[in-house]
């Protein structure tokens, strides 16, 4: 049930391969603070390669001999990648730890230190990405499009991973709204998030289709850069236009829940039309305690760099048409959202997933 997602800059000319090898996708988590050195929580900074965040959390719980609920992290990170992130373990007392004997497959401990507060979900500034794309075609078009993205941003769509394989989490959300019980709290949360994301993506897609993605209008709700603070736009003047151009404010779309839409005039009409087409979601979400919130529709990439790799630099192949790009994204935003606007990419981990599924299936059949 995934919707078609309109491109802001038209369909990309270039194509290429993503994650031909795990080291082609690197993520570096950035927290807004560093551990202070004392407190009940031990913060462990790790580099993981080809390892799932939940798997690492479970292994840390075993190592520290605590319940899994006492291990926290700011956000989930890709499995098929090299990622650096923090974990927090609740270990009251003054015991000093030496983690030299911590042995988790694919995990390297970078540092660890105590802190006086729990590491909570979402408590990160954002992530820096360093990606290598291989077999890139139409290099000139690729570099020109990258420059457009740097200057103008991309639609802040929720990535496909938000919706599960084939958009299955959206279907499960519909089952939830029709009365099916889901006891697992995390799964229920995933389905509700998928439903909200579906509405948001639908509104965003409609704004692009109606050519008002980058046009502020009376009745819009704008969000201040670097914050979640929003305000209703009563008047459009040259000052607000300039603030939008300077990326000081952004247009928003609804994260659906109980309460009235914050928009008015034409923006509210557009949002209400999308809601009418998705009544099951819009009537179901408030029943689970979710309230109306807003999310910016423009994703701005920052701290960007692009490098065309020579054959000497790209050890994976003799003749290189590989490109390395790096950029920073705020928390809750997806690198794949940037990539889909940049090129038609094939994620090579899809093949890995299929091979692993086949192997696991064969093992179960023979058990």
From Swiss-Prot:
> Per the database record, which ranges form the TRUD domain?
153-300
E.C. numbers: 5.4.99.27
Q: Which GO terms describe its biological process?
A: tRNA pseudouridine synthesis
- Does the keyword Isomerase feature in the UniProt annotation? yes
Record: active site? 78
- CDD domains tied to this protein: PseudoU_synth_EcTruD
A single Gene Ontology CC annotation of this entry is: cytosol
Q: Which SUPFAM superfamilies match?
A: Pseudouridine synthase (SSF55120)
InterPro entries with a match to the protein in the record = PsdUridine_synth_cat_dom_sf (IPR020103), PsdUridine_synth_TruD (IPR001656), PsdUridine_synth_TruD_CS (IPR020119), PsdUridine_synth_TruD_insert (IPR011760), TruD_catalytic (IPR042214), TruD_insert_sf (IPR043165), TruD_pseudoU_synthase (IPR050170)
| Recorded catalytic activity of this chain's protein | uridine(13) in tRNA = pseudouridine(13) in tRNA
Question: Does this UniProt record's set of keywords contain 4Fe-4S?
Answer: no
Gene Ontology molecular function: any one: tRNA pseudouridine(13) synthase activity
- The record lists its disulfide bonds as none
List UniProt keywords, sorted A-Z.
Isomerase, tRNA processing
Question: Which purpose does this protein serve, as stated in its record?
Answer: Responsible for synthesis of pseudouridine from uracil-13 in transfer RNAs.
PANTHER family, per the entry: TRNA PSEUDOURIDINE SYNTHASE D
Family, according to the entry, reads as follows:
Belongs to the pseudouridine synthase TruD family.
What name appears for this protein in its UniProt entry?
tRNA pseudouridine synthase D
**What gene does this protein come from?**
truD
């Amino acid at each position: 049930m995934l919707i078609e997602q309109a491109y802001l800059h038209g369909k990309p000319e270039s194509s290429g391969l993503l994650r031909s090898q795990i080291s082609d996708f690197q993520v570096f988590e950035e927290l807004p603070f560093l551990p202070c050195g004392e407190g009940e929580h031990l913060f462990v900074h790790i580099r993981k390669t080809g390892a799932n965040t939940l798997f690492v959390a479970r292994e840390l719980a075993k190592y520290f001999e605590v319940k899994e609920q006492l291990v926290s992290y700011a956000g989930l990170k890709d499995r098929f990648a090299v990622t650096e992130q923090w974990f927090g373990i609740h270990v009251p007392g003054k015991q000093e730890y030496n983690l030299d004997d911590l042995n988790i497959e694919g995990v390297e401990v970078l540092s660890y230190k105590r802190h006086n507060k729990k590491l909570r979900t979402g408590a990160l500034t954002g992530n820096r990405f360093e990606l290598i794309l291989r077999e890139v075609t139409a290099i000139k078009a690729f570099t020109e499009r990258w420059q457009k993205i740097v200057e103008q941003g991309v639609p802040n769509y929720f990535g496909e991973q938000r919706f599960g394989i084939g958009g299955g989490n959206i279907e499960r959300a519909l089952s939830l709204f029709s009365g099916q019980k889901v006891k697992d709290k995390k799964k229920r949360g995933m389905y509700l998030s998928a439903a909200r994301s579906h509405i948001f993506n639908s509104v965003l897609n409609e704004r692009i289709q109606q050519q008002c993605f980058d046009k502020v209008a009376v009745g819009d709700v704008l969000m201040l850069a670097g914050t979640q603070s929003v305000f209703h736009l009563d008047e459009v003047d040259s000052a607000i236009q300039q603030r939008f151009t300077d990326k000081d404010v952004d247009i928003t779309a609804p994260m659906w829940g109980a309460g009235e839409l914050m928009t008015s005039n034409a923006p509210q009409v557009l949002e209400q039309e999308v809601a009418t087409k998705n009544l099951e979601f819009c009537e179901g979400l408030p029943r689970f305690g979710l309230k109306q919130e807003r999310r910016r529709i423009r994703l701005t990439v920052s701290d960007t760099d692009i490098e065309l790799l020579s054959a000497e630099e790209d050890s994976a192949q003799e003749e290189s048409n590989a490109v390395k790009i790096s950029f920073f994204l705020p928390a809750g935003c997806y690198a794949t959202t940037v990539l889909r606007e940049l090129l038609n990419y094939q994620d090579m981990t899809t093949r890995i997933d299929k091979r692993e599924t086949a192997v696991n299936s064969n093992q179960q059949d023979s058990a």
